[in-house]
């Protein structure tokens, strides 16, 4: 069955076929970052599975890498953009999954009611840089005491390729330099071939030793 976004009150699904809409899995290989994702989702006792996803509408533009055709999250990206109709409302636990079946169970009476005249309340949570600055000042970043994840940890998600841009640029520069050196080598070989041809022609055209003519008497 098609998957849907695990964020509360978000109806985006794989089957929507919307352009510029991508889905991203939870960073299970980085527990601290995973805790931030789950906390920002706003669902009580929510436990994502390996195939649970969240759509790209819940990330700020700076969370994505500008290189490539597909939207790739940066290694420290955190979902912070949510539109909750009631910020104090927390949905009950729907099980350990974030797929479409759990999504149907997560629908509450409040979600089925029409929005208020004022419209949904746009809630933007503090981004990761602000939380890191708070930690540097000696203050707790969140009630759970989140810490900054250690750099260099392996990850199986798209945002783990934080150095993808740098690696591709280095590859392009290397290929360009290789092409230049090949042209230079080709020119050197051509020059060497011409020089050898001239030397061979010179040797073939050089006259051999001749006998001395006898001296004529007076």
From Swiss-Prot:
Q: Where is this region: Disordered?
A: 97-120, 133-154
Positions of post-translational Phosphoserine modification: 100
Q: Which SMART domains match?
A: DM3, THAP
Could you give a single Gene Ontology term from the biological process aspect? positive regulation of transcription by RNA polymerase II
> What are the residue ranges of zinc fingers typed THAP-type?
1-82
Locate the transmembrane regions by residue number: none
By its UniProt entry, which InterPro entries does this protein fall under?
THAP3 (IPR026520), THAP_Znf (IPR006612)
> Per the Swiss-Prot or TrEMBL record, what residue ranges does the short sequence motif HCFC1-binding motif (HBM) cover?
156-159
Q: In which tissues is it expressed?
A: Highest levels in heart, liver and kidney. Lower levels in brain and lung.
The family database entries (SUPFAM superfamilies) matched by this protein are listed as: Glucocorticoid receptor-like (DNA-binding domain)
A molecular function (GO) term: DNA binding
Q: Which UniProt keywords apply?
A: DNA-binding, Metal-binding, Phosphoprotein, Zinc, Zinc-finger
Q: Which domain of life is it from?
A: Eukaryota
Quaternary structure and partners: Component of a THAP1/THAP3-HCFC1-OGT complex that contains at least, either THAP1 or THAP3, HCFC1 and OGT. Interacts directly with OGT and HCFC1 (via its HBM).
Report the protein's function. Answer: Component of a THAP1/THAP3-HCFC1-OGT complex that is required for the regulation of the transcriptional activity of RRM1.
Q: What is this protein called?
A: THAP domain-containing protein 3
Q: What is the lineage of its organism?
A: Eukaryota, Metazoa, Chordata, Craniata, Vertebrata
């Amino acid at each position: 069955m098609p998957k849907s976004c695990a964020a509360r009150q978000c109806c985006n699904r794989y089957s929507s076929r919307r352009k510029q809409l991508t889905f991203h899995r939870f960073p299970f290989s980085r527990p601290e970052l995973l805790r931030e994702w789950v906390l920002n989702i706003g669902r009580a006792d929510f436990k994502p599975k390996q195939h649970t996803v969240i759509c790209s509408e819940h990330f700020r533009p700076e969370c994505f890498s500008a290189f490539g055709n597909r939207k790739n999250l940066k290694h420290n990206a955190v979902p912070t953009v949510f539109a909750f109709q009631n910020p104090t409302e927390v949905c009950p636990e729907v099980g350990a999954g974030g797929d479409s079946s759990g999504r149907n169970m997560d629908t509450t009476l409040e979600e089925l009611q029409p929005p208020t005249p004022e419209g949904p309340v746009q809630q933007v949570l503090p981004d990761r840089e602000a939380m890191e600055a708070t930690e540097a000042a000696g203050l707790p970043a969140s009630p759970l005491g989140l810490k900054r994840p250690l750099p260099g940890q392996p990850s199986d998600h798209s945002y783990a390729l934080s150095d993808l841009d740098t690696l591709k640029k280095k590859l392009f520069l290397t290929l360009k330099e290789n092409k230049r050196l090949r042209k230079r080598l080709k020119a050197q070989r051509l020059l060497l071939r011409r020089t050898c041809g001239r030397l061979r022609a010179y040797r073939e055209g050089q006259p051999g030793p001749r006998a001395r003519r006898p001296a004529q008497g007076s």
